[in-house]
Design a protein with these regions (language model features):
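Positively charged, small/polar-rich N-terminal and surface patches that mediate targeting and assembly
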Residues: 1-115
Length: 115
């Protein structure tokens, strides 16, 4: 896959969901990453939080004695605003409970790993 010149103004999208969220029986974060990869996005990062709470105000933590942790997951994607805008309707279908934010960023270096 070739990448266009990526430096300059881009959009950072953050998708905040729970670890137990699913899409057609698959972990939601995995389904989103697969969708982004198939659509040719330059990359995505999945971050697993050690603790947090969201709209439900239920505090989730990674303490060992908890059986149901449902830790916070944040996906980060940096891409052109146009490409992100095109996938928002699909994300709206997939994300049943969560938060999606967009912000402008300035990419100063993007160097894909050599295979």
């Amino acid at each position: 896959m070739t990448h266009e010149k990526f430096e300059g103004e881009r959009t950072l999208m953050r998708i905040h969901i729970g670890e137990s969220d699913k899409w057609h029986g698959k972990p939601l974060h995995e389904a989103i990453v697969e969708m982004l990869r198939k659509d040719g996005f330059s990359g995505a990062t999945v971050l697993r939080g050690v603790a947090g709470y969201g709209g439900s105000s239920i505090y989730h933590t990674d303490k060992l004695l908890r059986l149901s942790q449902d830790l916070p997951i944040v996906l980060e994607v940096i891409e052109s605003a146009e490409r992100i805008e095109r996938i928002l309707p699909r994300l709206d279908e997939m994300v049943d409970g969560g938060l999606i934010t967009l912000e402008k960023v300035r990419v100063i270096l993007y160097r894909p790993a050599k295979k």
